[in-house]
């Protein structure tokens, strides 16, 4: 049984379950993350696309991979750059890929600068040719607003040496290393080879955050992602990998990309077992009430019924389970969070918070609670949709 918690932690437990998005709870992720079954396969230099429903933990997985290979306070194993999808109007095919690569190079330059400012020893101990290449690459690809960039870098420098290095790399003229008309692929190849000379094995471009672009038509974002994932010149570069975390709505289009067809990119689906979902749920609740650990039996004596309820109506995503259990957590916190709630409270919560019917009209998917109902006959679906609308 868990001990009584103070009012501050009670407030955390009742409010923190509102967001249920990893990017807004990054401080909790090291405490609550559970490795999916194929986690180890995601950590190398192979390009991959991981597909999952909204709330399945794609961003949490991306953040965990980043923490592993690019921890906050030590030099990284890989240069990890997160690129946010932003469909380019009236730009298609190869031109869209070039826009993506230019943006990725800009992000690489900013990330590399941040690493060197935080870890100036990496630069100071590097051979002169490596120092010259980094200086040139950063100058060639950072934003034009260098004063603003410098202000940001100065905040991240851990000592005066880092600040001085940041000023040098941003403002001091750099010697050109490659010709101005050098292809982006050649620039990336030169960058990765240089990074490897200081112990950074390569570059990961992580792509996440599709949801805002899927509220309307998915055609434009699908077309541009297919173009990027079909550019074999990028996918064949040594020390360069794309790791995309994509919603299920894009899966059928992405599978047509040349990179997947030719086996340059691995396609995987993010799934969880009921046991993993239980652990994720328990860890979230424990973190949010300030406890090192917690089990469903600590919330309520009806823990077996609660687990069955979650498996039946919580669906297959962590967000689904956390949404479903939110009323129980609220009741637990309101009661003082010192003793498991009785059966009567759980039975009352089931009556007052029944799982509701919802239909994704765009995707023709039917849900009760957070669980999808599969195998509906067309006639039954049309009737449900008519009543729902």
Map each language-model feature to its residues:
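A short, basic N-terminal segment
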Residues: 1-48, 53, 68-74
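P-loop NTPase nucleotide-binding core
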Residues: 46-47, 53-203, 216
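Short, amphipathic alpha-helical segments that act as regulatory/interfacial helices
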Residues: 66, 105, 109-113, 311, ...
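The catalytic "switch" region of P-loop NTPases
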Residues: 184-312
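Amphipathic alpha-helical "lid/sensor" segments that cap RecA-like P-loop NTPase cores
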Residues: 289-293, 298-351
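Trafficking entry modules
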Residues: 350-361, 375-378
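Short, Lys/Arg-enriched N-terminal segment that forms or immediately precedes the first helix
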Residues: 361-373
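Short amphipathic alpha-helical recognition elements used for nucleic-acid or partner binding
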Residues: 373-389
